[in-house]
Amino acid sequence: MITVGCDRPTSLAAIDVAGRFEGVWATVGLHPHDAKDGVDTITDLFDHPKVIAVGECGLDFYYDNSPRDLQRVAFAEQIQLAHRLALPLVIHTRDAWDDTFDILRAEGVPPNTIFHCFTGGPAEVATCLDFGAFVSFSGIVTFNTATDLQAAAKICPLDRLLIETDSPYLAPTPHRGKRNHPAWVPLVGAFIADLRGIAAEDIAASTAAATCLAFPGIAP
């Protein structure tokens, strides 16, 4: 299980949980909502052995909780961190695909880049795949209205496809609207398996393998 940091306090909490439990790892990042805090507030946290990625980071032009110019700077700085530390990069992007892609092109895409809680369609997934990135689908893919997202899940190669819950948010159907839990990730996998006409066990095996590729720090 990977628990995600979004600012200094949540990154410290993620490290604490990862340090106390076997099979749990942490990421350290500055979410675009908190970009105004500055990336220097988290850079001392990457030395912990259970920290396996930078993020989540990126751009969120839906809420704009931090000014967009600061979001862009913080995202670029965290891409540079991922390069310098040779760590995977976990990306959050909302209503900002073009800017996200432009910054990645400018800074260079880290070898293990993950588009977390992917919300795009076939065109966006194609660009992510062109970057060599992994694409992670959450409970949103189970929603009846998520037809473009479902189309993307059908065409994403299995060796690049990940699943997640984004707990405590975005509980999958039939639990939509409830507090989400990591234990519900099989519902996401089973839904995608049904979309693709394959067995849920095949999705379980492929996503386990792809997760170890995306996050080398958790590989056995």
What annotation goes with each model-predicted range?
Residues 1-220:
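Mid-domain alpha/beta scaffold segments of enzyme catalytic cores
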